[in-house]
Regions:
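Short, ordered beta-strand-loop transition motifs
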Residues: 36-41, 61, 102-106
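Long, continuous compositionally biased terminal/linker segments
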Residues: 46-82
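Short, internal acidic amphipathic alpha-helical interface segments
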Residues: 69-112
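Short, highly charged C-terminal tails/helix-capping segments
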Residues: 146-161
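Long, contiguous binding/interaction regions
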Residues: 132-136
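Charge-rich, low-complexity N-terminal segments
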Residues: 1-55
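Hydrophobic residues embedded in beta-strands of well-ordered beta-sheets
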Residues: 42-44, 64-66, 107-109
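A short acidic/glycine-rich loop-to-helix N-cap element
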Residues: 118-130
Length: 161
């Protein structure tokens, strides 16, 4: 609470990586979603069908957060990076959460949001509702994004691009 003296005792984590990974797995199973899981990078990959394009979603569980990452199959040309970044900024300022970004190394556009679970108690319903909002946001803006960058087939790994 604001104004209260902070305790010098470290807070115990409510959740750990293994329990959150299992919660994500349970959530996907309850929703009967097809997914792949990588033990090496501790991430789940799911493909949703948007209005006109598939939406690849990766849920990456680390020691503090669940990262929702969608690497879009859209690539900007180097000479358009400045314009694309400006347009992405315009989209981002209207979003309630998350951000679209341009990778300057390869020109690919992605959308990402991280949920810090350390002091929270997320549920199956929360994971599924959050994923629905995440996918809905990507789907809502993919038309604008297709006007900024060209479509390519380049699905990337959530951890290593």
């Amino acid at each position: 609470m604001f104004g209260r003296r902070k305790s010098t005792e470290p807070k115990a984590m409510k959740q750990d990586t293994d329990s959150i990974t299992e919660l994500v797995r349970r959530s996907l199973d309850v929703a009967e979603l097809k997914y792949t899981y990588s033990n090496a990078t501790n991430h789940f990959s799911i493909v949703f069908m948007g209005d006109d394009l598939p939406i690849n979603v990766n849920l990456v569980v680390d020691d503090l957060t669940i990262r929702f990452v969608s690497h879009l199959d859209l690539k900007a040309k180097p000479e358009k990076y400045k314009d694309v970044a400006w347009e992405l900024n315009g989209i981002n300022k209207r979003l309630r959460f998350g951000a679209f970004y341009l990778d300057p190394d390869d020109g690919m556009i992605s959308f990402e949001y991280s949920f810090p679970y350390v002091e929270a108690n997320p549920s199956t319903d929360f994971i599924l509702a959050f994923m629905k909002m995440f996918v809905g946001t990507v789907d809502e803006h993919d038309g604008d994004l297709k006007n900024l960058a060209e479509s390519v087939s380049a699905s990337r790994n959530a951890m290593y691009g």
